[in-house]
Amino acid sequence: MPTVPAALTRPALVWAGGTQEQGADMDQPIWLTFLVAFVFMNVLLIGMAYMTWYERKVLAAMQDRVGPNRTGPKGLLQPIADGIKLLGKEDLIPANADKVVFYFAPLVVFVVAITRVAVIPFGNITIEIFGRTINLWITDLNVGALFLLAFGSLGVYGIILGGYASANRYSLLGGLRSAAQVVSYEIILGLSLVGIFLISSSLSIRTIMEEQTRDLVFGLGPLTLTLPNWFILSQPLAFVIFFLAAVAETNRAPFDLPEAETELVSGFHTEYSAFRFSFYFLGEYINMIIVSLFAAVLFLGGTDGPGAERFWGIGILWLLVKVIIFLFFYIWLRGTLPRFRYDQLMGIAWKVLLPLVLVNIMVTALIRLAGSGELPLPF
């Protein structure tokens, strides 16, 4: 009888006081934590800027075009030029708009998006610079995965408020669409991760990433097969469901119903321009990067890869490669698939993905019980 991988047979989650992992960042001075947060958030903003360049280049290659190539070498300064142009635009406010809410709504989307980076580990070790021990994460919450999921759903408030405050029917309809879409797909997104929580016995993102650094060894007669313990191998269905739900949650094509240009002009941000529009724009692309980091850490081993144990920089490089690959699939979907109808969007969530993710949870739980000997088997 084939053996069950050890990763599926560990003890269940224990919630009794203090048995979960405690934050390893508590020994770091608070000023150093703020400095790390400042660096991480600025790196995220720079990454977001060049995500737009990357997307335009990939789409251009798919459509047999050149893409941005005028501003700087290979168009690498195009994001800077776009930002300057955007900030120079006139900031228009509809006459009948609720001005306070209109001002406030885009900021909600941006702040919620960038706050999510706080629980993403860029490595599972500490490094020493100028005699100071520095963590490669801002904070290590023992429920970091729940934090990411919760804040991912909070951004929809900024979209709904922006659509409502614009005094525009297209904007309001876009906001309502976004609310229904997030409610539907946030459930799918969370349930797709339950299998990982069962396997790793933790909700801490650092613990889940560390769990994947242990190789799985399978004996096949005289041969031995060694595979990385990445959860994409033990949870392939969950990974596919997570990816589809993540694309829908971030309002990206082919799930971009809240801003469908052919139906709603520009949806919830139809009336926004200049600086305030940039907050919506920043929020969307930052969410894409955060979700890609989330997927890389939970399913693809995070910083795990050849040579990562020798130098922390190699681990970060592996994490970056995985994020870029995940972002490529975002762009690939946009360049190849048409937008779904709204009834198709909801049907996929409730009639297809929800039953599949529940089956995945049940199968994972049964395998885990069988491996631990707690499930009576007829053989």
Predicted regions and their residues:
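Selective transmembrane helix interface/packing segments
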Residues: 23-379
